[in-house]
A protein has these predicted regions:
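Cysteine-nucleophile amide-bond enzymes
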Residues: 24, 30-250
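Short, Lys/Arg-enriched N-terminal segments with co-localized hydrophobic residues
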Residues: 1-6
């Protein structure tokens, strides 16, 4: 285990997007005190919402094979947890409070079926949708120290998710990197961008964007890291809106 329980950790959050020139899907939200317009979300329980999201992903250029595999995971997850606390049909308008789920019940139901498999997290889910659109340098430097839960999930998954080459791309994309002991956001942005550039991380052939939330973990002056703590896939829709696909639970 890491030393999280023994040392004070300061974490800052940056948001990056790798842009092109489960189970929670959101439609646009305007975060402003001056508007009452808010987005909507779905847990993709019903066939109609899954069909709508599938079309948006395919229209963005994502592989039908990848999208179908992801939807299979969505249906398995929802079935396993018996749709506990999920939106049963379509999209539900977001309120000022975050959606609440019975996490203990969900965990109990999941562990009953999968005692060793913790499930696919946000990083695995996002990458699985876009894996054939992402490329990296063959000899890229990798630090997978913060991917231990991902590795455990892939090891105990009911089916093999990635090839050896895809796993290398996955670990390169989500690699942990050293950074400076500072709260200056620009410094960390440059560090992350430089690492992706050195490892030739590229996305092509799709209108989809990979959105990543980058955390700055600090244990003091001599131990500072950047790691990707959350990821999702953002795609445009034909009605000029945005659809964000993210996994919020193992």
């Amino acid at each position: 285990q890491r030393r999280y329980s023994h040392m004070k950790k300061i974490t800052y959050v940056l948001i990056f997007a790798l842009l092109v020139p489960y189970l929670f899907v959101t439609q646009p939200t305007v975060a402003s005190a001056k508007t009452t317009h808010r987005g909507a979300y779905s847990n993709l329980v019903d066939a109609k919402s899954r069909k709508e999201v599938k079309k948006a992903l395919l229209d963005a250029g994502l592989s039908e094979k990848n999208v179908n595999a992801w939807l299979s995971d969505v249906k398995d997850y929802n079935k396993t947890i018996k749709n506990t606390g999920l939106v049963k049909k379509g999209f539900k308008k977001l309120s000022t409070k975050n959606p609440q789920y019975d996490e203990n019940k969900i965990m109990e139901l999941w562990n009953k079926k999968y005692p060793d498999f913790i499930g696919y997290n946000c990083r695995i889910t996002a990458f699985d949708l876009m894996k054939d659109k992402i490329s990296v340098k063959a000899d890229a430097k990798v630090n997978a120290s913060n991917l231990f839960m991902d590795q455990d999930a892939l090891k105990h998954a009911p089916a093999k998710k990635f090839t050896k080459k895809q796993k290398h791309v996955f670990e390169t994309l989500y690699s942990t990197l050293n950074t400076a002991y500072t709260t200056d956001v620009d410094t960390h942005i440059k560090k992350q961008q430089k690492a992706w550039k050195q490892n030739e991380v590229k996305i092509s052939g799709t209108k989809a964007s990979l959105i990543t939330v980058v955390f700055h973990s600090s244990f003091g002056e001599n131990e500072n890291e950047l790691f990707i703590g959350h990821a999702g896939v953002l795609v445009p829709t034909k009605d000029k809106k945005l659809l964000f696909v993210e996994k919020l639970s193992f």
